Amino acid sequence: MSSEVIKRENVEVTLKVVVEAAKFEEAINKAYNKMKSRFNIQGFRKGKAPRKIVEKFYGVEVFYEEAFNIVFPEVYEAALDEHNIDPVDHPKVDLEDIVAGQDVVFTAVVEVMPEFEVADYVGIEVEKKEYNVQEEDIQRELDGLAEKNSRMITVEDRAVKEGDMVIIDYKGMVDGIAFEGGTAERQSLTIGSGQFIPGFEEQLVGKNIGEEVEVQVTFPEEYHAEELAGKAAIFEVKIHEIKEKEVPVIDDEFAKDVSEFDTLEELTNDIKKNLEEDAKNRAIQEQRNDVIEAIANKVELEIPSAVVNRQIDNMLADFDYRLQFQGLNLEYYLQLTGTKEEDLREQMRPDAVKTVKNELILEKIGAKENIVATDEELEEQLEKMAKQYNQEIEKLKTNLRQQDLNAIKEGIIIRKTVDFLAENAKLI
């Protein structure tokens, strides 16, 4: 076997590999022994026909594909080792026409991590960030707490208005025919939430309990149910209940009810303290991000598409995981929004490229500065994970693969590298 690098361009390397005719002949014999039971040729018991007879009936190339599959892993790995190539994904293989008795030649195009250098990363100048807590910030938190502790109460002496919750029955029809999913009983709907088709909720404003209302709407052109998109519909609606939100008064009693404090002043001071801590952490995190961005802006490198695609896979999986906390999943989200997964992936691509680039740069700096993850730091991180997943740490360790542990260590190194860069940055 012989090999050579015939092209190296950015993150793409093209290898040419030659397999000696004798070695490929051995692979053909192995392929014959593996496949011979498939052939049923007259005059021979099934699987007993000699190789030459099988080739005569089915063509000399009958075993070529399997023979190549047999020989490829060995010669491909040998070529990678010879040229010190570490691919990030499977190769794109182009096999030249195979001629009996001659050497077999193929090319393999692989992506590799980019080669680059990072310099002048110590003492990076970034703007000092500072966020001050204002009275309106504290009031916003108090209002949010009051809103969270509000309750819905039934009203009977007035008509529906914006912000009310109504309990309704409805039956939708297109061209006088009821459609699937268009009928419900005692459905709750908050007026102004945009939960229903545009124009539906507004037509209930001013109506009273017990009224039967004919609501006329047109489904949006981009509506997820294609058979309804753009069509006019009539909903027969009956209003059973009207409820309004009762928000508690923000006073000492409120503070006692919603917190561990006895007075509103104590609650307010605690909120202020937490907001100031959040503001401080926000400033620190933004400064850290600015340091990374300033360094990354000075480095030009191409990211292998396979690595970017894997990062997008991770981002999609994380997005799907977060959707599940809202009672959704990725498939339903795509259907609901009329978005194709390919389009969503493309929307994520710029962030994926940025994430991978930053990680590569931080890994390079970490290696130059001899930053490592100690056993104690790994153990501390595993303890945090065990607590997060509500799991015994020994059980967690048992379930983790070596590659998982390596990824955790890499995360620790990246965090420590950012710490190093932030500590050595100049705030201006």
From Swiss-Prot:
Keywords: Cell cycle, Cell division, Chaperone, Cytoplasm, Isomerase, Rotamase. It comes from the Bacteria. GO terms for molecular function: peptidyl-prolyl cis-trans isomerase activity; protein folding chaperone; ribosome binding. The keyword Isomerase applies. GO terms for biological process: 'de novo' cotranslational protein folding; cell division; chaperone-mediated protein folding; protein transport; protein unfolding. Its main location: cytoplasm. It is found in: Cytoplasm. Consists of 3 domains; the N-terminus binds the ribosome, the middle domain has PPIase activity, while the C-terminus has intrinsic chaperone activity on its own. This is Trigger factor. It comes from Alkaliphilus oremlandii (strain OhILAs) (Clostridium oremlandii (strain OhILAs)).
